[in-house]
Amino acid sequence: MRGGALLAKHPRHGMLFSMNQLGKSRRKFLLHSCELAAWYGVLRLGFQHRAWARPIARGTEQWSRELAHLASEVRAGRLAPRAWQHAIEELHSTMTISELIKVLDVDEVLRAIKYPKEKLGAIQDIGLPALEPRDTAGFGRKLFVYRKGSCTPPHAHNHLVSAHLILRGQVRTRKFDRVEDLQQAIVIEPTVDDVFGPGHTDSMSDDENNVHWFEGVSDIAVTFDVPVWNVSPAKTYGYPANGQIFIDPTVPARGDGRIVAPIISFPAAVRKFA
């Protein structure tokens, strides 16, 4: 299903709630709403009164510092994972893509990049302006380069948030909420299947779109990824992982629209999707 339409809506829950449950749900919703509003206020204040009002070169430095600050906040538990997603999407939306392409040396990376023999996206670690290595502990800075038809196979993460900002070209993005972990499968619910271009950010966390799958649509597409690890360290998962958990979301969906996606190895994911 394309054109931005959601593949499936969340199922309706039963209407028999106790007043205590309803109160807890309302408090949780209000707390989350206040948290997002507070972070939007902080970001907008920074955009209006700090480096965002200065020449763009200073803007990229402040953008880098804000990325590091957001990573520190979510790792420390002072910012909820879903709030981090909205905050980094808001932050990226303030930047000029052409300037980021220059400051992140995208053209130089494209000249030197070594593509895998399989149709997988190539990955290059990069630096950020105005940041020393000590400033970037706990989060990554990566360029993903996709040839037409190459991909990052579908996978889930534990204890991680990340955001891919498209800098060049077109990328097909398929995302899924992670509903339940089984012994050798993950129950997922499709949320997005669409093609996006420069300026669009795709983020993920445990709470929203934990499973993603990217495929290059144009001859060359480039995304800038900011993964932040060791998030919510006390959380337990039904399926542990040291890194990516590769799955096959192409199996038929259940009657409720959800998919019981088998967990597969990385070589199996490469054979099937690349």
Where are these regions (language model features)?
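His/acidic/aromatic-lined binding-pocket segments of jelly-roll/cupin-type domains
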Residues: 143, 161-165, 214
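Short acidic-glycine-tyrosine-enriched beta hairpin
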Residues: 180-209
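C-terminal segment of N-terminal export signals and the immediately downstream linker at the start
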Residues: 43-85
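Conserved short histidine dyad/triad with adjacent acidic residue
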Residues: 142-157, 206-209
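N-terminal secretory signal peptides and thylakoid transit peptides that target proteins
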Residues: 12-40
